[in-house]
């Protein structure tokens, strides 16, 4: 689960730290800031409810771009020698693990903690020293404590998926589920081990399971894969082993809060075609303190990375913080009627490893007659790792899975996914596998169109049907350089070594606008940035602002021809500048015959 609350676009520039060998590549990645100033929660007393105030349009955004730029720019940089004192410095001095924790540890303790942190992505050293039954603050809205629920609710099977999880973290997940789920509602716990190599997860875990099962025979089941199948297929393995009417599918680094189960089971009992997500809080990866997260719906951008969204306006109008939140998608952990999950098609096992399955499930459920909700009265704390140790880069898997979703479920809007990933719509070169069965499932379930989904379920999502060309933009004078958004704070486009990632995505529209950078996913996000002639200088300005101010944002362009501003008649061209890293800068000047080309053309680029 890699969704976070807020991101800031970073630049695609690499910097060598003076006197050090570290190369910092500032990419378009999720640089996390909190959407709402959060409080580290230490006490057990519930905080008073905050008055509900509708967010005025600052949607909580995604984190996760793990592309690596080093390979495409290494020819332009050289490793700087380390200073002797830096070479002798302790390896843990710059680790984020010790920013807010561990100052009192001995050097040996720090080394051990850092080694475990690098392996797990969170502070396993601290986790091993925390009690399994530690108390959690009750972060539910106060109204949740006054709700009543039916006496007769369906039982639930809780499934935990893991690979090489720290044993103490896994056991705390199990223990919190047992302690904070009413015994008459929790039928069993199922552990799906996706072929872990960690020895602790074999003998010691077996000892723990045997101890529990000696008191409650068959209560904990363990499913062990003989090879790694990935998160998606592991969830399905857990579902297959479950026997309760309701199945809860979770990561194995969570802690359940009091009263989480009753609201969920009540909503599913009322309508078995509802898939439910709890509201999530954060377990800080470094000090394991609980950070309260604001209530949110769950959605996605056009690359199909998951994102937290503001609750819809209809929810705010209720002025009831306990009300279910209608959600376009899921972020990975969810609770579902066991039989309905099978009827709707489980998860797409043709997907690989991780990513996109949560979006696909949400789209499928909505289009095929079900619904998705987030419940404010059901709260789960979840560790957001500092890094994912089980894979170096999730991007390739998410991209492949996203294209698979697009081809099955998104109709004419599948083009948006290809555009967001900067991939040709024909002959993409990416094998998405056989989707025949998934298309047959859609037909069998008589599902609605994706346009219906956008209009009825996810109206916040921006549509980009006016884009007629996209990709990287190159000049004939220097073809190894591409137009790049440059430093985000300066709004000045630059020419940079071509790498084809988000900062170099260019979109040309039928209204002759040139968008540079990410396709803004929703109407609540910051607007797209358009290329504008500002006092004879190229600048990137929010498109809506530039249009409202009647700025010079329209450009005549045809493939292999000049890019000329329609009002000023100046052309976007390259000019040599030896002071710049790559020797060229972008200028607006009298047209001299320079030509531009863009990677993918959808319709004719008539000037």
Swiss-Prot record:
InterPro entries per UniProt: GalNAc-T (IPR045885), Glyco_trans_2-like (IPR001173), Nucleotide-diphossugar_trans (IPR029044), Ricin_B-like_lectins (IPR035992), Ricin_B_lectin (IPR000772)
Single GO MF annotation: metal ion binding
Stretches for region Catalytic subdomain B: 324-385
Keyword hit for Lipid biosynthesis: no
Binding residue positions for Mn(2+): 251, 253, 382
Glycoprotein found in the keyword field: yes
Side of membrane Lumenal, spans: 36-607
GO biological process terms on file: protein O-linked glycosylation
Reactions mediated catalytically: L-seryl-[protein] + UDP-N-acetyl-alpha-D-galactosamine = a 3-O-[N-acetyl-alpha-D-galactosaminyl]-L-seryl-[protein] + UDP + H(+); L-threonyl-[protein] + UDP-N-acetyl-alpha-D-galactosamine = a 3-O-[N-acetyl-alpha-D-galactosaminyl]-L-threonyl-[protein] + UDP + H(+)
Function comment: Catalyzes the initial reaction in O-linked oligosaccharide biosynthesis, the transfer of an N-acetyl-D-galactosamine (GalNAc) residue from UDP-GalNAc to a serine or threonine residue on the protein receptor.
Family: Belongs to the glycosyltransferase 2 family. GalNAc-T subfamily.
Protein name according to UniProt: Polypeptide N-acetylgalactosaminyltransferase 18
């Amino acid at each position: 689960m890699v969704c976070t609350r807020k991101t800031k676009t970073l630049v695609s520039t690499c910097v060598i730290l003076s006197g050090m060998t570290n190369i910092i590549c500032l990419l378009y990645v999720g640089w996390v800031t909190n959407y709402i100033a959060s409080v580290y929660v230490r006490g057990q007393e519930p905080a008073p409810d905050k008055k509900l105030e509708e967010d005025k349009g600052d949607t909580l955004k995604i984190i996760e771009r793990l592309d690596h730029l080093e390979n495409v720019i290494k020819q332009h940089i050289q490793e700087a020698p380390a200073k002797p004192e830096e070479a002798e410095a302790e390896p843990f001095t710059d680790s984020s693990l010790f920013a807010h924790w561990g100052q009192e540890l001995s050097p040996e303790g720090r080394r051990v903690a850092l080694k475990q942190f690098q392996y797990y992505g969170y502070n396993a050293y601290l986790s091993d020293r925390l009690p399994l039954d530690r108390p959690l603050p009750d972060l539910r809205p106060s109204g949740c404590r006054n709700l009543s629920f039916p006496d007769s609710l369906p039982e639930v099977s809780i499934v935990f998926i893991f690979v090489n999880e720290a044993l103490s973290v896994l056991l705390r997940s199990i223990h919190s589920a047992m302690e904070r789920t009413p015994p008459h509602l929790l039928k069993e716990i199922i552990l799906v081990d996706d072929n872990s190599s960690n020895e602790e997860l074999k003998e010691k875990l077996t000892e723990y399971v045997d101890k529990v099962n000696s008191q409650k025979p068959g209560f904990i089941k363990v499913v062990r894969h003989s090879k790694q199948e990935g998160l998606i297929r592991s969830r399905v393995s857990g579902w297959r082993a479950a026997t309760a009417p309701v199945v809860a599918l979770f990561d194995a680094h969570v802690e359940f809060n009091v009263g989480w189960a009753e609201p969920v089971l009540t909503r599913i009992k009322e309508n078995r075609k509802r898939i439910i997500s709890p509201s999530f809080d954060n377990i800080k990866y470094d000090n394991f303190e609980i950070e309260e997260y604001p209530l949110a719906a769950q959605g996605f951008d056009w690359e199909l990375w998951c994102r937290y969204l503001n609750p819809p306006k209809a929810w705010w109008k209720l002025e009831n913080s306990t009300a279910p939140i209608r959600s376009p998608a899921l972020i990975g952990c969810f609770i579902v009627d066991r039989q309905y999950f099978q009827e709707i098609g489980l998860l797409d096992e043709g997907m690989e490893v991780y990513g996109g399955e949560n979006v696909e499930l949400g789209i499928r459920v909505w289009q095929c007659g079900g619904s998705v909700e987030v419940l404010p009265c059901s709260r789960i704390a979840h560790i957001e790792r500092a890094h994912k140790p089980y894979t170096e880069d999730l991007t390739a898997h998410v991209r492949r899975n996203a294209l698979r979703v697009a081809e099955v479920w998104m109709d004419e809007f599948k083009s948006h996914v290809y555009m967001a990933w900067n991939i040709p719509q024909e002959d993409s070169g990416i094998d998405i596998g056989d989707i025949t069965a998934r298309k047959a499932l859609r037909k069998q379930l008589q599902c609605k169109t994706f346009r219906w989904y956008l209009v009825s379920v996810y109206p916040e999502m921006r549509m980009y049907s006016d884009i007629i060309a996209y990709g990287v933009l190159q000049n004939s004078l220097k073809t190894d350089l591409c137009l790049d958004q440059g430093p985000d704070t300066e709004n000045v486009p630059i020419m940079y070594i071509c790498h084809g990632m988000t900062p170099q995505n260019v979109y040309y529209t039928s209204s002759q606008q040139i968008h540079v950078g990410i396709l803004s996913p929703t109407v609540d996000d910051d607007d797209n940035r358009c290329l504008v002639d500002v006092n004879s200088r190229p600048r990137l300005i929010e498109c809506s602002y530039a249009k409202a101010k009647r700025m010079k944002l329209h450009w005549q362009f045809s493939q292999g021809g000049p890019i000329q501003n329609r009002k000023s008649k100046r052309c976007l061209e390259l000019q040599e500048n030896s002071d710049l890293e790559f020797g060229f800068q972008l200028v607006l000047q009298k047209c001299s015959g320079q030509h531009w080309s863009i990677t993918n053309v959808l319709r004719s680029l008539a000037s």
